[in-house]
Regions:
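Active-site microenvironment for binding and transforming phosphate-containing groups
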Residues: 1-181
């Protein structure tokens, strides 16, 4: 589910809805910020030409089951704008070099995104899957920016990593706001 805030007066209600398990927040008004927290999952920020935006939390389930796609579709509905005009920013996440998964998860990635999402039969590339998914929905590849930073490779230095810490760690955040000036 995507929590949607269409006016500043709805912030408390949107926050409450998001806290019940939303994987994304879409903001369609000025003066409202969104913050989602991450460890190894991919933060995704989608921005429409109007300045309306969505922030999505994309762990492997969020990638495979389409939290990013639901956020994009919600933003398209909110703005009336087509996806080819949107910009997508993918923040730091666990890269394939450290993201070894079971056969069932690898199959789900392959079935959803094809060969590009797998480095080998046990290592998943969430960034490639996200880029492929956004492109399949009409977002131009040149409008998709991936910071290409691994949370495990930089654990403790720049980022928190659930996997690198053995399950005990802090979180880093993806913050988005529309500032008028």
């Amino acid at each position: 589910d995507v929590a949607v805030c269409e006016n500043a007066g709805d912030v408390a209600e949107t926050r409450e809805f998001a806290a019940e398990g939303s994987d994304a927040v879409a903001v369609g008004c000025d003066g409202v910020a969104a913050l989602l927290c991450f460890a190894d999952c991919a933060p995704v920020i989608i921005v429409a030409p109007s300045g309306k935006f969505a922030v999505a939390h994309c762990g492997w389930r969020g990638v495979v089951y389409g939290a990013w796609a639901t956020a994009l579709s919600t933003l398209c509905e909110l703005t009336g704008e087509p996806p080819e005009r949107f910009n997508v920013y993918i923040g730091p996440y666990i890269h394939a070099c450290h993201f070894e998964v079971g056969e069932e998860v690898a199959k789900q990635f392959f079935d959803s995104f094809g060969e590009a999402s797998l480095v080998d039969e046990r290592h998943v590339d969430m960034g490639a899957a996200l880029r492929c998914g956004f492109a399949s929905m009409g977002v131009a590849p040149e409008r998709i920016a991936d910071v290409d930073m691994c949370t495990v490779c930089d654990a403790g230095e720049r980022f928190y990593s659930y996997r690198a810490s053995g399950g005990t760690c802090g979180r880093h955040g993806a913050f988005a706001a529309r500032i008028l000036g």
